[in-house]
Amino acid sequence: MRHSRPGRLAIAAITFAVALAASGPTIANTGSPPPVRTPAGAPIVADWLAEHRRYTDWHLTLVDPLYRATSTYAPGDLVPVSRAGIAGRGYVRRFVVADLAALDRAARAAGIRLRVVSAYRSYSSQHSVFQSWVERQGYATAIRYSARAGHSEHQLGTTLDFSFVGGADPWNYADFASTRAGAWLKANAWRYGFVLSYPKGAERLTGYGYEPWHYRYFGRSLAAQQRSSGLVPRYWLWRRN
C-alpha cells in the first residue's frame, strides 16, 4: 500500500490542477485546489482503501469520495453516547466520551442542550442509507449529499451529527448553523476536539454538500492544529498522511 499510494496522490494532484484550471477560481485561503468534478457537477469517486486502517489510526484515517474503510471496520470499544451525559442516541469510541461530556457541559453553561442525532454507523447501515438516497433522489444527487458504504466518517466511531433538545433534526433547518446550537458548535466545538468536516462554501474541496451538524473528533490538540491550518479537514488529513 505504501508503494502504491504516492503514485495515486501524484495522479490525483495533477488531475486536481487540470480541473482547477478548467473550472475557474477556487475558494479563497484554502491552500488546495478543489476535487475533480464531472461536467454534471458530481465529485469523481474511487474505491481506494485508506492507508491508515488500524483502529489506533483513528486520527489519521481518511475516508472521502476516493478513500474508504474496509467492510469489516467496526471498533470494539464503542459505547453509548449517553455515557457522556448528552441527550440523543448512538455509539462512539470510548476515548471520545470525556471530551463529548465536556462539550455538552460547556454548551449547557451557554444555555444550549445538545442532542446527538447520529453517531457510529456500520458499513451495512451506510450502504442502506446511500441506497435510500439513490432510490429517492437518484445517483447524481446521492453521491453529492451522502457517502457510499465505507466512505462515511461515521463508520470510524468518532463522528457525530448534532442537533439540540426540543429541536428538529439538523438537516430540516434552512441552515443549522443559524440556530443557537449550530452557531455555538461552529464557534466552540474545536476547543473540545471536534472538527466540522464539511463547512459552507467548501463543497468543491470536501466532495460533499455543506453539513453544519457533522463533526469528527480529533482530540483537542489536533483540532486546534487543523483550525490553525486554514484547510478543510480532508486536505489537512491529506497533508498529514
Regions found by a protein language model. Give the residues of each.
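Extracytoplasmic cell-surface/polysaccharide-interacting catalytic and binding patches
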Residues: 2-8, 12-119, 123-241
